[in-house]
Amino acid sequence: MAIQRTFSILKPDATERNITGAINALIEKAGLRIVAQKRIHMTRGQAETFYAVHKERPFFGELVDFMISGPVVVQVLEGENAIAKYRDVMGATDPSKAADGTIRKAHAKSIGENSVHGSDAPETAAIEIAQFFAGNEIVG
Ligand code: CMP
């Protein structure tokens, strides 16, 4: 299996509760390397662009409002099969359905305030990484 990169966000409910280190520990325990990371406060425009695929969904406004409600930590994670591996580590979008040992089972508050985002495919990972990081900010 090839080494891949995926894009991750530690969401405002995680920064608000000061649990970014606890989440990073689960990421690293799974064998993923944090090869880029920065704490930012997303603008409304950045959040709308990032979640444009969900524009027609009824929760879009709520999702954007939440993502700009406080700081987030954006990351690039690297490792074998990183995209699928991180989705396994995150657990189901709805924390009530997330498996034991996953980030969302341990930390997410609700389907909206679900602590983390991870890319769903190589194409989206490349687009999401490029939205927030220049090539020279990623150090593998
Ligand atoms: P994420 O992986 O960041 O991708 C899209 C996000 O939309 C998802 O995580 C959830 O946080 C959010 N989301 C999905 N379904 C709902 C919903 N029914 N209500 C509010 N937010 C949702």
UniProtKB/Swiss-Prot annotation:
Sequence positions that bind ATP: K11, F59, R87, T93, R104, N114
SUPFAM superfamilies per UniProt: Nucleoside diphosphate kinase, NDK (SSF54919)
PROSITE patterns hit by this protein: NDPK (PS00469), NDPK_LIKE (PS51374)
Catalytic activity, EC: 2.7.4.6
Annotated GO MF terms: ATP binding; metal ion binding; nucleoside diphosphate kinase activity
Pfam families: NDK
Record-linked InterPro entries: NDK-like_dom, NDK-like_dom_sf, Nucleoside_diP_kinase, Nucleoside_diP_kinase_AS
Lineage: superkingdom: Bacteria
Record family assignment: Belongs to the NDK family.
Annotated localization: Cytoplasm
Xref: CDD domains: NDPk_I
Protein name, UniProt field: Nucleoside diphosphate kinase
Catalytic activity reported: a 2'-deoxyribonucleoside 5'-diphosphate + ATP = a 2'-deoxyribonucleoside 5'-triphosphate + ADP; a ribonucleoside 5'-diphosphate + ATP = a ribonucleoside 5'-triphosphate + ADP
GO cellular component: cytoplasm
GO BP annotations listed: CTP biosynthetic process; GTP biosynthetic process; UTP biosynthetic process
Enzyme class: transferase
Entry function: Major role in the synthesis of nucleoside triphosphates other than ATP. The ATP gamma phosphate is transferred to the NDP beta phosphate via a ping-pong mechanism, using a phosphorylated active-site intermediate.
Positions annotated as active site in the UniProt record: H117 (pros-phosphohistidine intermediate)
Cofactor(s) of this protein: Mg(2+)
Disulfide bridge map: none
Subunit structure: Homotetramer.
Keyword presence, Translocase: no
